[in-house]
Amino acid sequence: MDSESVHEAEIPQRRLRVGVLGFVVLGVLAIASVLMVLFAVPMNTRYWGIFENFLDLDVYRHGGSVVVQGLPLYDGPVLKGMMFTYTPFAALLFTVWAVLSFKQAIVVWTGLNIAALFAVIVLCWKFLGYRLDAKTYAVSALATTIFLFMEPIRTTLWLGQINIFLLLLIVWDLGRDETSRLRGIGAGIAAGVKLTPAFFWAYLFITRQWRALVTAVVTFAATVAIGFVVIYNDAYKYWTGTLVDSERVGPTDAPSNQSVSGLIAQLTHTPTPSRILVLVFSALAACLGLGAAWVAHRHGQKLLGLTMTGLTATTVSPFSWGHHWVWFVPLVVLAAHYAMVSQKRWAWVAPFVFLLPVLNWSHTWWDPSVIPGTDRFVGMGLFMFVPPEYLRIPTVGVYLWIFTLAAVSTLVLFGWKKWKIPASDAPAPVTTAA
């Protein structure tokens, strides 16, 4: 560990430096966010309105119902042609939702998602050394409202997805002090529900967090074992075949597949991109992202290390739909934190650089045949825009470019410039080492 580094856990408790003007700005942005969520795509628009979908939540419910009824889980669609793509352990968890009506599930699930988003933001401030006082909670509530218009968050709520819960589980678990005996159990459970979080094992390995790594792997193995014990046939089918069936997920060249494979498929205009290209660029992205995570961890920036790992996992995953990128939430919080401690006004550009491109910008394709009952198809997120050919590279892979910017910024600030975060709220300027 660099002797000049300041660990987040070692920073005396700070106070959020948000005055009247700051609250006014946050309040205006929060109101604008709510209006955009409700009316940019009119909330009563069939299928596309914020309260008119929840397809994935219904799939979760029906997957749980299939388990309760003792029927095969992976032999065919569980709802409207939709396959159940999660683990047997996840299906067991979803049995709880099978007892609720669809409308009841929507209300409870949405409320819990918003509460989980608020909890993630509060935990970010906590792990960055801020006091959890009334001001921190107020700022977190306003930030939660602003982030509702972030595309990964809006789409997660719109579909009834599980991403925010997994984000909360990992941030709470791996953001804790490394001396915590059960640290790693949350990451193991998250991987047991959805395999992508297993990527955090690589982060624990390169940062030599052996106890957390072992705990995560053992916990994951326990979730697999539970699946075999309770629904053996489904577990056997999943782990011996269904797991690698990419056709159950979706087309690789879908615009909303914001991963390396999706970007290559889009740029080469093919649903089956070259495996060699995908492997090479995925490996490069993994090295870049994990390298940034390692540098952040080495310089005591644990939350930044976790965030870079989460962004890297979504980048290199074969399928990373827009709603998987919920790690933009801690990224923007981190950018705001670094702007506050840098004491330079221009640093406040950073949170907006990371936030604006990932908002739920939408456009309309006038084609009545696309969605029965409506006269338009509403694409959400910059990646759904149909740009001229010369603008395809910056738009179709916009989330990957945000990841790249975050990784390079981390390497430059903490790897090259050796940025030293002030250890208190003292007005001393932030310095860098040559």
Q: Residue locations for each model-derived region?
A:
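Primarily membrane-embedded glycan-assembly and transfer machineries that use lipid-linked glycans
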Residues: 2-183, 207-322, 378-395, 414-434
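Juxtamembrane/interfacial segments around transmembrane helices
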Residues: 73-83, 167, 191-199, 244-248, ...
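A cytosolic-side transmembrane-helix exit/cap motif
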Residues: 184-187, 234-241, 326-330, 345-352, ...
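Short amphipathic alpha-helix initiation/capping segments at coil-to-helix junctions
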Residues: 301, 305, 320-328, 338, ...
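Aromatic-enriched
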Residues: 40, 336-434
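Hydrophobic core segments of transmembrane alpha-helices in multi-pass, intramembrane catalytic enzymes
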Residues: 162-171, 195-198, 215, 325-333, ...
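Transmembrane alpha-helices and membrane-interface helical segments
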Residues: 119-123, 168-176, 204, 330-344, ...
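Transmembrane helices and adjacent periplasmic/lumenal helix-loop junctions
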Residues: 187-204, 316-327
